[in-house]
């Protein structure tokens, strides 16, 4: 949690601090964005449908057209490889964050852009969140869902106000969204928290929705290592070990 807290100290203010796009990269017809970097979560596999692969490339090109740099999981295989190459080939900066232990498995050939090797998954997620102004999930598996749900939860808790989007290719995320809707109807997720999740079937439509997103919660929650030292003992006296 300490590493995630360090990331979110920057992330809470990051959207405002990095809203202005940087110069460089892209072409003369580039559509500017309020986002400097978008973090993309996606699978290290390509999936069984060509539409998933096409969507990864489409998303990469959309980021390039809008002058947005990419933050991602650092792999060169699967959808990660496709989206990172599309952004890099288009002249935008790519930041890949990957645990050292995963490099032999997920990096083949020459990696693109800037590769940051970290100690483990917690540091990876914290670094990706720190660099990003928004988050997009392409189709993926357990790892993609874990990363996605963490930033959704952080938004619900008011730790950050960065938009979170699903690129819902061929209805891939329909079952997930149905589960969220059921959790709302059963009283486990608040209706305003449901609106944290933005989805669209195409990259262009999704990025437009992210641009228009208005946060549901105010940033303000802090982790225990950010609290004043004088307050921490009062908390500790209420905690018992099992």
Swiss-Prot record:
More about this protein: The name lonely guy came from the fact that flowers of the mutants often contained only one stamen but no pistil.
Family note: Belongs to the LOG family.
Outcome (variant: residue 73 to D): In LOG-4; decreased activity
Chain ranges passing through the membrane: none
Protein name as it appears in the record: Cytokinin riboside 5'-monophosphate phosphoribohydrolase LOG
InterPro entries the record matches: LOG (IPR005269), LOG_fam (IPR031100)
Disulfide bonds: none
Protein EC: 3.2.2.n1
Stored Gene3D superfamilies: 3.40.50.450
Localization per record: Cytoplasm
